[in-house]
């Protein structure tokens, strides 16, 4: 457990550090995780977490029916699927650092993206940020507790213990925002 908490791949760790440094200017010029919590904590009770899997397509009609009755937290991989079906999430979350994941944001959905908050881990691939900016999407870069990040004294922005998957990240954010 101790080894895993410090990472299990030095090249992956170096990639995360490099991408964090590259993304740092965007992190400090956008709203912080602490601001997100202070402005949106407790504003609603019901959340729906949408992840990609074999059952997503089957559940789309049901999701569309209840979309206006709950806050939708959406995994990055589900975002283009929801957009295609006109189901607007309130939040889209992403934590992967590989370039392939960035492609979920390489699209222009125009007005559909208005009022969606994109919550992205600060070590994400820079293409993710590039695509979010290109389409004028509102986003926040969030950091988890990591030694190299803590040395930079960015406590003002807050730390988000987000788990190991985007679905877990979504669940934890619903908890931190006091959804029931």
Regions found by a protein language model. Give the residues of each.
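Glycine- and other small-residue-rich loops at beta-strand/loop junctions that grip anionic moieties
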Residues: 52, 121, 159, 163
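N-terminal donor/sugar-recognition subdomains of glycan-related enzymes
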Residues: 1-49, 54-70, 84, 89, ...
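Short, glycine-/Ser/Thr-/acidic-enriched flexible segments
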Residues: 54-55, 78-79, 123-125, 146
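Alpha-helix C-terminal capping segments
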Residues: 80-86, 173-178
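Short internal beta-strands
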Residues: 70-78, 90-98, 116-123
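Active-site/ligand-binding-proximal alpha/beta "capping" segment
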Residues: 126-179
């Amino acid at each position: 457990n101790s080894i895993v908490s410090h990472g299990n791949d030095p090249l992956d760790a170096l990639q995360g550090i490099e991408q964090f440094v590259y993304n740092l200017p965007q992190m400090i010029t956008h709203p912080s995780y602490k601001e997100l919590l202070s402005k949106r904590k407790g504003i609603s009770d019901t959340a729906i977490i949408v992840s990609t899997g074999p059952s997503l397509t089957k559940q789309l009609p049901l999701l569309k029916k209840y979309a206006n009755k709950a806050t939708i937290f959406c995994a990055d991989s589900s975002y283009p699927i929801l957009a295609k079906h006109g189901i607007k999430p309130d939040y889209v979350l992403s934590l992967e650092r590989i370039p392939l994941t960035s492609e979920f944001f390489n699209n222009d959905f125009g007005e559909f993206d208005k009022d969606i908050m994109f919550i992205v881990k600060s070590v994400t691939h820079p293409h993710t940020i590039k695509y979010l900016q290109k389409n004028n999407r509102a986003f926040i870069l969030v950091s988890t507790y990591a030694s190299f990040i803590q040395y930079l004294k960015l406590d003002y922005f807050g730390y988000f213990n987000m788990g190991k998957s985007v679905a877990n990240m979504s669940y934890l954010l619903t908890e931190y925002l006091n959804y029931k």
